C-alpha cells in the first residue's frame, strides 16, 4: 500500500525523511522464557555491516546473516504485566564482586575487569569460549548461587536452567536486573546489551531487522559484531517515565530521542479524547476493552488485540472503555523538539534497590532496580519547544507536537483484525 502511494500513506515530510517505507513497528511482545542476549547496531555500523555482507555474497534472507538493512533499531518496551529485563551493564564494582564470588573460571575475567571500557572485551571473551568452557562457567555459577544475592541468584538461576552450556549466563551477571511494573517503560538505544526474561509488553521500534545476538538463543550469534556495538556505560538504566500534558487530557506520553520510537497511552473510561496530531502516520493498538475511532470520513470499532492505521495529519477521536496505545511517527523537525526534554528528564532519574537481603559489606551489590523520576517531562518548561516551533513555522504545544493548525487532513482509519 505504502509503495503505491507513499505521499498519501506517509505524508510529504516523513516520505522525504525515510523514503517509501513505514519506519516504525508496533507490536505486543509476550515473553514466556528468556529471549536472546542482544544489542542493535548504530546506523554507521549497520551501513558498514550491510555493505560488507553484501560484498561477501551472503543472501539477505540467510539465517546466518547479521545485517539485513542499513538502519539502526532503537526500541522501547512498555510493560503490560510485570516484566523482568536485563538491561545495560551494572555498576563496575558490583560486576567485579559477582565474578569474584563465583570464582573458578570467572576469576581471570574479574582480574581483567578494571574499568568500564573493559566490559565489551569481557563479554566477548566469555561468549567466545568453546562449548566445554561455557559449560564450566555455567556450572560454576550454578554451584555459587547460594552465595549470591537472592535477586541475582533467582534471575541467573532460571537462565542457567534453560541454557546450561551458554556463557550468556555469565554475561547476565554483568547486567542490571530490572523489574518493570505495568506502565513502566525502557528505551533501548543502539549498543545497549539487553535480554527480556518474562512478561508482556507493548514494543515500538525503528523498522529494522538488525539484531546482533551473543547468546541465550538457538538463532545465529555474531559475537565480534556484538562486541563492536557495545559501549562502556555502567550503572542502573533509567526508565522512561510517562508524562501527562495539559494540552492532551487523558493521554500519557512515553518519549525518546528517536523520532521513530514513542508511545502514547490512552485509558478511556469517560469522555472521548482527541489523538494528538502529527504530520506523520499514527498506529493504534487496543490492549483492553473496546475503542471507537472517528475521523473526518470514517468510524471504526476496535476490540482488544486489534489495530488501526491513521493517515498523516488526520484528526482522530477515540471513545469507549478500554486502553489504546498510539505510536506516532514524528518528522525529524518535530522530534528535535523533544531532545532537550528527554536528556533533561533522564538526568533526574533516581533508583533504589528492591533487594533487602544484600550484605553490602560482603558483596556491595544493589542488583535489582526500579526507577523513579522526581519530575515529569511535562514539568520541565516549554521554552525549548516553543523555540523549535518558531524555527519550523508551526504551532507547537508544550510536548513539541505540531498542530497542523492551518489544515486538518481528512484521515482514513483502517482496521486490522
Question: What positions do the PLM features span?
Answer:
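Intrinsic-disorder-associated, low-complexity terminal segments enriched in Asp/Asn/His/Tyr and depleted
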Residues: 349-352, 357-359, 369, 385, ...
Amino acid at each position: 500500500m505504502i509503495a503505491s502511494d507513499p505521499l498519501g500513506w506517509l505524508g510529504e515530510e516523513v516520505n522525504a525523511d525515510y523514503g517509501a517505507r513505514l519506519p516504525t513497528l508496533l507490536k505486543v511482545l509476550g515473553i514466556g522464557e528468556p529471549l536472546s542476549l542482544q544489542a542493535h547496531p548504530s546506523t554507521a555500523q549497520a551501513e558498514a555491516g550491510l555493505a560488507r555482507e553484501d560484498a561477501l555474497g551472503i543472501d539477505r534472507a540467510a539465517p546466518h546473516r547479521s545485517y539485513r538493512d542499513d538502519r539502526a533499531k532503537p526500541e522501547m518496551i512498555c510493560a503490560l504485566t510485570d516484566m523482568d529485563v536485563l538491561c545495560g551493564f551494572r555498576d563496575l564494582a558490583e560486576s567485579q564482586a559477582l565474578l569474584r564470588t563465583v570464582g573458578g573460571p570467572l576469576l581471570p575475567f574479574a582480574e581483567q575487569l578494571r574499568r568500564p571500557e573493559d566490559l565489551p572485551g569481557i563479554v566477548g571473551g566469555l561468549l567466545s569460549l568453546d562449548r566445554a568452557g561455557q559449560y564450566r562457567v555455567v556450572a560454576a555459577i550454578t554451584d555459587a548461587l547460594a552465595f549470591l544475592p537472592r535477586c541475582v541468584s533467582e534471575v541467573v538461576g532460571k537462565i542457567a536452567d534453560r541454557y546450561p552450556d551458554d556463557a550468556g549466563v555469565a554475561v547476565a551477571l554483568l547486567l542490571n536486573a530490572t523489574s518493570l511494573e505495568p506502565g513502566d517503560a525502557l528505551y533501548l538505544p543502539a549498543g545497549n546489551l539487553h535480554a527480556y526474561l518474562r512478561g508482556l509488553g507493548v514494543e515500538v521500534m525503528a523498522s529494522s531487522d538488525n539484531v546482533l545476538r551473543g547468546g541465550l538463543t538457538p538463532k545465529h550469534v555474531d559475537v565480534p559484531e556484538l562486541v563492536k556495538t557495545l559501549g562502556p556505560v555502567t550503572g542502573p538504566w533509567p526508565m522512561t517515565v510517562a508524562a501527562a500534558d495539559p494540552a492532551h487530557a487523558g493521554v500519557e506520553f512515553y518519549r525518546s530521542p528517536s523520532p521513530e520510537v514513542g508511545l502514547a497511552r490512552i485509558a478511556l473510561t469517560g469522555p472521548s479524547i482527541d489523538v494528538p496530531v502529527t504530520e506523520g502516520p499514527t498506529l493504534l493498538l487496543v490492549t483492553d476493552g473496546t475503542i471507537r475511532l472517528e475521523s473526518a470520513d470514517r468510524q471504526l470499532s476496535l476490540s482488544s488485540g486489534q489495530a488501526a492505521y491513521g493517515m498523516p495529519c488526520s484528526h482522530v477521536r477515540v471513545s469507549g472503555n478500554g486502553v489504546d496505545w498510539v505510536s506516532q511517527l514524528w518528522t525529524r523537525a518535530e522530534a528535535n523538539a523533544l531532545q532537550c526534554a528527554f536528556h533533561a528528564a533522564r538526568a533526574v532519574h533516581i533508583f533504589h534497590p528492591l533487594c533487602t537481603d544484600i550484605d553490602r559489606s560482603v558483596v556491595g551489590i544493589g542488583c535489582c532496580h526500579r526507577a523513579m523520576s522526581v519530575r515529569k517531562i511535562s514539568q520541565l518548561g516549554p521554552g525549548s519547544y516553543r523555540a523549535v516551533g518558531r524555527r519550523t513555522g508551526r504551532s507547537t504545544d508544550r510536548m513539541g507536537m505540531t498542530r497542523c493548525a492551518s489544515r486538518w487532513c481528512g484521515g482514513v482509519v483502517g482496521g486490522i483484525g
